Amino acid sequence: SQHEQIECWNYAVEELSIKPNPMKKTTVKGSQFEQPLLEYNGACAGCGETPYAKLVTQLFGDRMMISNATGCSSIWAAGGSAMAYTANKEGNGPAWANSLFEDNAEYGLGMLIAVKTIRTRIANNVRKALESDMSEETKAVLQDWLDNMNVGEGTRDRANKLEKVLQNEDSEIAKKI
Protein backbone atom coordinates (compact mmCIF):
# COMPACT_ATOMS: atom_id res chain seq x y z
CA SER A 1 0.00 0.00 0.00
CA GLN A 2 1.03 3.62 -0.36
CA HIS A 3 1.24 4.08 3.42
CA GLU A 4 4.79 2.74 3.34
CA GLN A 5 5.79 5.61 1.04
CA ILE A 6 4.22 8.52 2.95
CA GLU A 7 7.51 9.51 4.56
CA CYS A 8 9.28 9.54 1.18
CA TRP A 9 6.46 11.58 -0.38
CA ASN A 10 6.51 14.13 2.43
CA TYR A 11 10.28 14.47 2.09
CA ALA A 12 10.04 15.00 -1.67
CA VAL A 13 7.26 17.58 -1.38
CA GLU A 14 8.43 19.49 1.68
CA GLU A 15 12.23 19.25 1.67
CA LEU A 16 13.43 19.13 -1.94
CA SER A 17 13.75 22.45 -3.71
CA ILE A 18 13.04 23.35 -7.31
CA LYS A 19 16.40 23.73 -9.03
CA PRO A 20 17.13 26.78 -11.22
CA ASN A 21 16.72 26.24 -14.94
CA PRO A 22 20.18 25.91 -16.58
CA MET A 23 18.77 26.89 -19.99
CA LYS A 24 16.46 29.44 -21.59
CA LYS A 25 12.88 28.71 -20.57
CA THR A 26 11.65 29.59 -24.05
CA THR A 27 13.46 26.70 -25.75
CA VAL A 28 11.88 23.26 -26.09
CA LYS A 29 14.54 21.63 -23.92
CA GLY A 30 14.74 24.53 -21.46
CA SER A 31 10.98 24.55 -20.89
CA GLN A 32 11.23 21.03 -19.48
CA PHE A 33 13.42 22.22 -16.60
CA GLU A 34 10.58 24.44 -15.35
CA GLN A 35 8.17 23.19 -12.68
CA PRO A 36 4.95 21.95 -14.27
CA LEU A 37 1.82 23.26 -12.58
CA LEU A 38 -0.34 20.51 -14.06
CA GLU A 39 -0.11 17.13 -12.40
CA TYR A 40 -2.25 14.05 -11.80
CA ASN A 41 -4.81 14.86 -14.45
CA GLY A 42 -7.66 12.46 -15.08
CA ALA A 43 -7.22 12.32 -18.86
CA CYS A 44 -7.54 9.16 -20.90
CA ALA A 45 -4.32 7.31 -21.68
CA GLY A 46 -2.74 8.80 -24.78
CA CYS A 47 -4.64 12.10 -24.52
CA GLY A 48 -2.87 14.65 -26.69
CA GLU A 49 -4.27 17.66 -24.88
CA THR A 50 -2.60 17.34 -21.47
CA PRO A 51 1.04 17.53 -22.66
CA TYR A 52 0.28 20.92 -24.20
CA ALA A 53 -1.51 22.13 -21.08
CA LYS A 54 1.47 21.00 -18.97
CA LEU A 55 3.90 22.79 -21.31
CA VAL A 56 1.92 26.04 -21.11
CA THR A 57 2.11 25.88 -17.30
CA GLN A 58 5.87 25.44 -17.59
CA LEU A 59 6.12 28.51 -19.83
CA PHE A 60 3.75 30.84 -17.96
CA GLY A 61 3.37 29.23 -14.52
CA ASP A 62 1.47 31.08 -11.85
CA ARG A 63 0.75 34.01 -14.19
CA MET A 64 -1.70 31.90 -16.21
CA MET A 65 -5.42 32.54 -16.35
CA ILE A 66 -7.42 29.72 -17.89
CA SER A 67 -10.97 30.21 -19.15
CA ASN A 68 -12.12 26.66 -19.78
CA ALA A 69 -15.16 25.43 -21.68
CA THR A 70 -17.16 22.51 -20.43
CA GLY A 71 -15.99 19.38 -22.17
CA CYS A 72 -13.22 16.85 -21.92
CA SER A 73 -10.68 19.34 -20.54
CA SER A 74 -12.98 20.32 -17.69
CA ILE A 75 -13.28 16.65 -16.74
CA TRP A 76 -9.57 15.79 -16.74
CA ALA A 77 -8.66 19.14 -15.16
CA ALA A 78 -11.22 19.29 -12.36
CA GLY A 79 -13.25 16.14 -12.11
CA GLY A 80 -14.99 15.58 -8.80
CA SER A 81 -13.06 17.02 -5.92
CA ALA A 82 -9.66 16.93 -7.64
CA MET A 83 -7.89 19.75 -9.48
CA ALA A 84 -5.11 18.88 -11.93
CA TYR A 85 -3.61 22.37 -11.79
CA THR A 86 -1.39 22.82 -8.77
CA ALA A 87 0.57 25.52 -6.95
CA ASN A 88 4.28 26.16 -6.52
CA LYS A 89 6.07 26.27 -3.15
CA GLU A 90 4.84 29.85 -2.59
CA GLY A 91 1.26 28.67 -2.98
CA ASN A 92 0.72 30.35 -6.35
CA GLY A 93 -0.64 28.56 -9.39
CA PRO A 94 -2.69 29.14 -12.52
CA ALA A 95 -6.13 30.67 -12.12
CA TRP A 96 -8.65 28.24 -13.62
CA ALA A 97 -12.35 28.83 -14.15
CA ASN A 98 -14.94 26.96 -16.15
CA SER A 99 -18.09 28.12 -17.89
CA LEU A 100 -20.88 25.61 -18.26
CA PHE A 101 -22.40 27.35 -21.26
CA GLU A 102 -19.65 26.96 -23.90
CA ASP A 103 -19.03 30.71 -23.80
CA ASN A 104 -15.49 30.51 -22.47
CA ALA A 105 -14.24 33.06 -25.03
CA GLU A 106 -16.61 35.69 -23.68
CA TYR A 107 -16.00 34.49 -20.13
CA GLY A 108 -12.24 34.75 -20.65
CA LEU A 109 -12.62 38.20 -22.20
CA GLY A 110 -14.46 39.28 -19.06
CA MET A 111 -11.59 37.94 -16.94
CA LEU A 112 -9.10 39.88 -19.09
CA ILE A 113 -11.10 43.12 -18.93
CA ALA A 114 -11.38 42.79 -15.15
CA VAL A 115 -7.62 42.26 -14.75
CA LYS A 116 -6.83 45.18 -17.08
CA THR A 117 -9.22 47.43 -15.13
CA ILE A 118 -7.62 46.51 -11.81
CA ARG A 119 -4.10 46.99 -13.22
CA THR A 120 -5.03 50.39 -14.69
CA ARG A 121 -6.40 51.48 -11.31
CA ILE A 122 -3.19 50.33 -9.61
CA ALA A 123 -1.04 52.13 -12.21
CA ASN A 124 -2.99 55.36 -11.69
CA ASN A 125 -2.51 55.07 -7.93
CA VAL A 126 1.20 54.37 -8.42
CA ARG A 127 1.50 57.57 -10.51
CA LYS A 128 -0.20 59.52 -7.70
CA ALA A 129 2.09 57.90 -5.13
CA LEU A 130 5.17 58.92 -7.13
CA GLU A 131 4.08 62.56 -6.69
CA SER A 132 3.60 62.16 -2.93
CA ASP A 133 6.10 62.41 -0.09
CA MET A 134 6.94 58.71 0.14
CA SER A 135 10.50 57.58 0.72
CA GLU A 136 12.93 57.47 -2.19
CA GLU A 137 13.28 53.70 -1.77
CA THR A 138 9.52 53.29 -2.12
CA LYS A 139 9.42 55.62 -5.12
CA ALA A 140 12.18 53.62 -6.83
CA VAL A 141 10.24 50.39 -6.36
CA LEU A 142 7.02 52.08 -7.53
CA GLN A 143 8.76 53.41 -10.65
CA ASP A 144 10.26 49.98 -11.39
CA TRP A 145 6.79 48.40 -11.12
CA LEU A 146 5.28 51.08 -13.38
CA ASP A 147 8.07 50.81 -15.98
CA ASN A 148 7.73 47.02 -16.11
CA MET A 149 4.04 46.48 -15.41
CA ASN A 150 3.55 44.79 -18.79
CA VAL A 151 6.67 42.63 -18.62
CA GLY A 152 5.65 39.17 -17.49
CA GLU A 153 9.04 37.90 -16.36
CA GLY A 154 9.88 39.14 -12.89
CA THR A 155 6.30 40.20 -12.10
CA ARG A 156 6.13 38.19 -8.88
CA ASP A 157 9.45 39.65 -7.61
CA ARG A 158 8.37 43.22 -8.38
CA ALA A 159 5.01 42.68 -6.67
CA ASN A 160 6.70 41.24 -3.57
CA LYS A 161 9.12 44.20 -3.38
CA LEU A 162 6.25 46.63 -3.83
CA GLU A 163 4.21 45.00 -1.09
CA LYS A 164 7.19 45.07 1.27
CA VAL A 165 8.02 48.78 0.84
CA LEU A 166 4.38 49.86 0.96
CA GLN A 167 4.02 48.27 4.40
CA ASN A 168 6.47 50.91 5.67
CA GLU A 169 4.37 53.77 4.30
CA ASP A 170 1.48 55.27 6.23
CA SER A 171 -0.31 57.23 3.50
CA GLU A 172 -3.79 56.55 2.12
CA ILE A 173 -2.43 56.06 -1.39
CA ALA A 174 -0.08 53.33 -0.13
CA LYS A 175 -3.07 51.56 1.38
CA LYS A 176 -4.99 51.83 -1.91
CA ILE A 177 -2.14 50.29 -3.87
Positions of PLM-derived features:
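Short acidic, glycine/serine/threonine-rich loops at helix termini
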Residues: E4-C8, A77-A82, T86-N88
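Cofactor-pocket helix-loop regions in the catalytic cores of large enzyme subunits
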Residues: F33-F60, Q143-I177
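Beta-sheet entry/capping signal
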Residues: D62-S67, C72-I75
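N-terminal leader/propeptide and maturation segments of large enzyme subunits in energy/redox metabolism
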Residues: F101-I173
